[in-house]
Regions:
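Bacterial Sec-dependent N-terminal signal peptides
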Residues: 1-34
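Extracellular or lumenal secretory-pathway regions
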Residues: 25-155, 161-163, 170, 215-290
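Short, hydrophobic/aromatic-rich segments at coil-to-beta transitions
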Residues: 35-40, 167-174, 202-209
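A generic structural motif
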Residues: 46, 175-177, 211
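Short, charged/polar low-complexity linear motifs in solvent-exposed/disordered segments
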Residues: 89-92, 183-185, 189-191, 201-203, ...
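Extended beta-strand-rich segments in extracellular/periplasmic secretory proteins, especially
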Residues: 145-189, 194-196
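Structured soluble/peripheral alpha/beta segments that form catalytic or ligand/cofactor-binding pockets
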Residues: 182-184, 193-229
């Protein structure tokens, strides 16, 4: 897991308050907006994947935020997308992928594929002036979509007398019923950034932890630092505007039948076994598509 330097909260606060906005009209570093704060999160989740059954994983994510906008993303995803955005990078990525496939075909060791497959296709950007989030994600085999949502989709209930400490910050509890799941989050007014992991935002402080009631999805901050890192646009241009529910239904079909789909698309070179009956108890972050 990537670890980030913990710094004094007064320095973080100063950096957040003193932010000066800039526009971003190209991918050049000097033209992109800069973050005030960088928060690393671990996303722990359980899901059902064909014949693999219940899979439990941890994936690192990063939130880059200032008072105007933010981006939540998986760093390995952004790295691969950046490679694929140039001819030389695409050649490098293809070489890595082909080598991993050859090793898998020879040894049938699925672990060799971990370094060359996407562990997430998720990006979430937020525009605080418009109070709108934009979610980019996979929508099936080779399909990628995006959609916009108003911040008002999330209706928070703050529980002032319920507190806990996360990364040394005093946090207050809030809860919401959001798109089929009940969530509990912990936010700290000590860091006046109304943002957090995934789509979560709109509370009077940074959200450091978020968990849904079944224990299948859990975001936990594991590092905070003042940062002037550039908030780059998303490299992948293959995302098409889609409806949120359509994206989730398409992805559900792919996940439920992924082994047979992958086998067919690779001419049988990759065969992870037969698909298995679907267990709907383990599902996506949002379940209201069913």
């Amino acid at each position: 897991k990537t670890s980030y330097l913990m710094i004094n909260r007064s320095i973080i606060l100063l950096g957040v308050v003193l932010f000066m906005a800039t526009g971003c009209f190209a991918r050049k570093k000097q033209d992109c907006p800069r973050a005030d704060i960088k928060v690393s999160y671990n996303y722990h989740y359980k899901f059902w994947r064909g014949s693999d059954g219940v899979v439990e994983k941890d994936t690192p994510f990063i939130l880059l935020a200032n008072h105007n906008e933010s981006k939540f993303y998986c760093p390995s995803t952004e790295y691969r997308d950046s490679l694929l955005s140039t001819p030389s990078g695409s050649a490098k990525e293809k070489k890595m992928f082909d080598a991993a496939v050859a090793a898998y075909v020879q040894n049938r060791d699925e672990s060799v594929m971990d370094a060359v497959v996407y562990h997430s296709r998720l990006y979430v950007t937020k525009d605080f002036a418009k109070s709108v989030s934009t979610t980019y994600d996979q929508a099936g085999m080779g399909e990628y979509g995006y959609y916009d949502e108003p911040f008002s989709e999330i209706d928070w209930q703050i529980v002032e007398d319920s507190t806990k400490t996360v990364l040394g910050y005093q946090c207050i509890m809030a809860s919401t019923d959001y798109h089929g799941r009940k969530w509990t989050v912990w936010f700290t007014p000590e860091i006046p950034v109304q943002d957090g992991p995934w789509k979560f935002c709109g509370l009077p402080g940074l959200i450091l932890e978020a968990a849904e009631e079944k224990g299948h999805h859990h975001f936990t901050a594991d590092g905070i630092e003042q940062s002037s890192q550039s908030i780059y646009p998303i490299y992948n241009n293959d995302y098409e505007k889609m409806g949120r529910l359509d994206m989730l239904r398409n992805l559900r079909n792919y996940r439920d039948n992924n082994n047979s789909i992958i086998k067919a698309s690779t001419g049988g070179m990759l065969d992870f076994g037969p698909d298995a009956p679907v267990q709907t108890e383990y599902d996506f972050l949002e379940t209201d598509y069913r």
